[in-house]
Amino acid sequence: MSALVLKLIAAVSMCVDHVGIVLFPKVVWLRYIGRLAFPLYAYFIAEGFRYTHDRLHYFLRIFLLGLGCQIVYTVAEKQLYLGVLLTFSMSVAVMACVSRLKTALTVPDTPTGERGRSVALSALLCALAVGTVFLICSSVTVDYGFCGVMLPVLVSLSEKKPVRLALFSVGVAAVLLECAGLPGAFVVNDFVMQAFSLLTIPLVALYNGRLGKYKLKYFFYIFYPAHLAVIYLISLIV
């Protein structure tokens, strides 16, 4: 499967999930379908970070769109719940720190010990980044929690597809366990629902590393706020 096909599966899954939440809250199977979205998007956040030519621009694109959606949501719902784009913004920030550490580890050492200082500084930045994310996730409600933030980071740790798939599988399982145990959740039912996210593992295993026939670079960024707006407007009418 190409990246385009998997991203379209994620988009449809997300849309079905949000339709279920807003318009048909009693139709539980819609939520089950929705469990495919987050892990697939998380995998391709890591892929996007891996291939982007401008990581700062990549971060800002996700963060600013997430911030805009967050402001609208917070004003409308009058509660602080950090949405998935802010989750992925934190993922990109941590991946940038990890990437710096990986680069520092590959630089040959010099008599002045510059490599050691660079590795130490990069490791400190990684620790601070992960610690800050953990503090944020412990202080406010973040979509998919700390494990959700770290899922793309896990995927980004290796360039080898089998290793990336293994890391992705571990990350999806961690997200499953964290989400099923969130305060206020009925653990048994929520665990069964979240377990459907494991279906993304064979889907990612089928990923062929190709972009796909059509380049829809910005479509998925536009689709996220657009489908939420349409669903919200429909909810006002019905």
Give, region by region, the residue ranges found by the protein language model.
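Alpha-helical transmembrane segments and their immediate juxtamembrane cytosolic regions
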Residues: M1-V238
